[in-house]
């Protein structure tokens, strides 16, 4: 698989994840009804609830100064208000734009294993190229090792581990390159067990030079919005779309 194919695969995976979240939201709210609680120049409010149950029930409130959702999906507040309206919550860019308007304290984050591993793959490949002085050995390296890393490089993780294991196994103790490949092998083994942000940050801080991350390694983003938070945003988005559609029907009647 070449770089373009890998990039397209990454895009396809992202779209599949988004579709799965939309389907989940639709299933969770399939019986919901959307009732207007307030409709004034100062306040717009809706109750999003299925009959005879409070499961996934929540209210959406919009004032001049902000938007809030409260209820069975855990409360969230946004730093935009009536000028954006319910149409803002009904937008299509959920993971970036809608998320970007959350109040800071609502932006829950978690470890991004793919981003962490992608950074290591790119850095380690750079180190391998710089430390492979023999032209024949360099030519024998896979194309993906010699190319600059990019989106989807986390998918090379197992391939990189296999490559380093194989190269290290062919070099006897005391031979040229033994210490280099041994250290890479040890670091990749350690990195495979890392599963939270603080642990990854300490690891990168201690080994940024050996991993080829550069002195600005601290700028590498290794966390992402919490998965459960994004799922809640999809629930809110689904409800907002239903409310917008309901308003359009009322105007057309």
Where are these regions (language model features)?
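Contiguous, function-dense segments enriched for cysteine-driven chemistry
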Residues: 46-48, 90, 221
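An exposed acidic His-Trp-rich patch
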Residues: 87-169
């Amino acid at each position: 698989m070449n770089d373009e194919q890998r990039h397209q695969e990454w895009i396809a995976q992202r779209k599949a994840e988004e579709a799965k979240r939309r389907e989940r939201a639709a299933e969770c709210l399939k019986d919901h009804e959307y009732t207007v609680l307030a409709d004034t120049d100062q306040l717009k409010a809706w109750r999003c609830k299925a009959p005879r149950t409070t499961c996934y029930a929540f209210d959406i409130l919009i004032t001049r100064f902000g938007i809030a959702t409260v209820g069975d999906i855990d409360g969230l507040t946004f730093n935009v208000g009536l000028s954006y309206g319910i149409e803002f919550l009904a937008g299509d860019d959920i993971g970036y734009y809608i998320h970007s308007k959350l109040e800071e304290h609502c932006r829950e984050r978690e470890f991004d294993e793919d981003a962490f591993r992608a950074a290591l793959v790119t850095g380690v490949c750079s180190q391998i190229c710089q430390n492979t002085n023999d032209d024949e050995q360099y030519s024998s390296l896979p194309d993906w090792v010699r190319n600059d890393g990019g989106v989807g490089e986390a998918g090379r993780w197992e391939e990189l581990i296999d490559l380093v294991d194989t190269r290290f196994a062919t070099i006897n103790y005391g031979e040229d390159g033994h210490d280099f490949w041994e250290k890479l092998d040890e670091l990749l083994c350690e990195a495979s067990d890392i599963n939270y942000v603080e642990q990854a940050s300490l690891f990168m801080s201690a080994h940024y030079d050996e991993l080829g991350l550069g002195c600005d390694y601290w700028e590498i983003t290794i966390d992402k919005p919490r998965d459960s938070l994004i799922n809640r945003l999809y629930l809110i988005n689904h409800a907002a779309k239903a409310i917008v559609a309901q308003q359009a029907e009322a105007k057309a009647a």
